Amino acid sequence: MKTLLLTLVVVTIVCLDLGYTMTCYTQYSLSPPTTKTCPDGQNLCYKRWFAFIPHGNKFFRGCAAACPKAEHNEVVRCCARDKCNL
C-alpha cells in the first residue's frame, strides 16, 4: 500500500511538471521590466542588441523556440531559465 501511494505521488509530480511554461522578460530597451509567459514550444529567452550604436544600446527581449540568428553588428544571447534575459 505504501509503495502504491509513493508511486502515485511521484506520477503526480511528474505530470504537473510536464505543463511547465517558460517566463521571459519582454521589454524593449530600458523600459520598466515586463514579463510574458511563453507559448508552448518556446522554451528559450533571448536578448538581442546592436553592438555599435553610438548613444547606448537598444535591447530587445522575448521568447523563442530557437535562438535567433544575429544579424550584422548584432549580438544575441539565449538562455533556458525563467527571467534569465534581463
Curated annotation (Swiss-Prot):
Compartment(s) where it occurs, according to its Swiss-Prot or TrEMBL record: Secreted
Tissue expression: Expressed by the venom gland.
Chief location bin: secreted
Alphabetized UniProt keyword annotations: Disulfide bond, G-protein coupled acetylcholine receptor impairing toxin, G-protein coupled receptor impairing toxin, Neurotoxin, Postsynaptic neurotoxin, Secreted, Signal, Toxin
GO CC terms: extracellular region
SS bond list: C24-C45, C38-C63, C67-C78, C79-C84
Gene3D superfamilies cross-referenced by the UniProt entry: CD59
Coiled-coil region list: none
Signal peptide coordinates: 1-21
Molecular function GO terms recorded: toxin activity
Oligomer and partners: Monomer.
Function statement: Binds to the muscarinic acetylcholine receptor (CHRM).
Family: Belongs to the three-finger toxin family. Short-chain subfamily. Aminergic toxin sub-subfamily.
Listed name of the protein: Muscarinic toxin 38
Lineage, top ranks: Eukaryota, Metazoa, Chordata, Craniata, Vertebrata
